[in-house]
């Protein structure tokens, strides 16, 4: 992606954002750049806003929420659940996502963990915290990224086009349902929440009182049905390498 396209896509999110959101985002980007002098932080500085850069607001069809980036080397790339194509060992949650993709759509397991082709089709792959210290999960959860990511999720609830939220895990479910309620969005406005347990090996096969198990939930075909029923083109989920 060239720099002009990247800036233009990010501007679809931040151009009209309230000043406190823009100020906080700029402050955090500067702070993270400063902290890199004394600690290893993921993802790379230029990748922090990749979710917004690859999926402009007017193209969003599906939102997949994560919590924070992978905290091991050569994994985080600014898109939730995604790893670079050069990463040969897939994280366990992504392996389960691919198993469910195969079961749902009958496609082969993708050879790469790079989900950029999904993002380029309108799948917003957003972590609610955008950075993490190496080997320290949730270490940046209280830095203030929620000012930006809460705003982005609220924007998704208010977009004119149909949007399907794939809420994997209790955290994502509560986040999405809370934002839908707060913005008055829902089925009548073309906004849908498909919730299940998280694809982590600890929960992927375990239904709870509130959530069906991720494995067997068939989220990809379900999202496409909702998109098509409301006049939007489906996502080509099997486009990965």
Residue ranges and their predicted role:
Residues 49-58, 156-158, 177:
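A short acidic-Thr-Gly-centered motif at the start of a beta-strand
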């Amino acid at each position: 992606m060239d720099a002009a396209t990247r800036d233009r896509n990010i501007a679809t999110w931040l151009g009209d954002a309230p000043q406190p959101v823009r100020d906080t985002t700029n402050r955090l980007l500067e702070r993270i750049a400063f902290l890199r002098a004394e600690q290893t932080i993921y993802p790379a500085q230029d990748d922090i806003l990749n979710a917004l850069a690859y999926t402009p607001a007017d193209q969003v069809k599906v939102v997949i929420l994560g919590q924070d980036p992978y905290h091991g080397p050569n994994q985080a790339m600014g898109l939730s659940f995604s790893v670079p194509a050069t990463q040969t060992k897939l994280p366990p949650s992504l392996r389960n996502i691919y198993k469910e993709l195969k079961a749902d759509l009958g496609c082969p397991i993708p050879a790469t963990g790079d989900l950029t082709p999904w993002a380029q089709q309108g799948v917003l792959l957003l972590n609610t915290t955008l950075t993490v210290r190496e080997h320290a999960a949730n270490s940046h959860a209280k830095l203030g990224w929620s000012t930006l990511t809460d705003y982005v999720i609220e924007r998704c609830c208010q977009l004119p086009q149909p949007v399907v939220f794939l809420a994997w895990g209790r955290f994502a479910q509560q986040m999405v349902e809370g934002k839908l309620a707060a913005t008055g969005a829902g089925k009548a406005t073309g906004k849908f929440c498909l919730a299940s347990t998280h694809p982590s090996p600890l929960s992927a096969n375990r239904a709870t009182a509130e959530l069906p198990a991720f494995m067997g939930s068939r989220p990809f075909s379900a999202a496409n049905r909702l998109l098509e029923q409301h006049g939007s083109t489906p996502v080509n989920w099997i486009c990965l390498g």
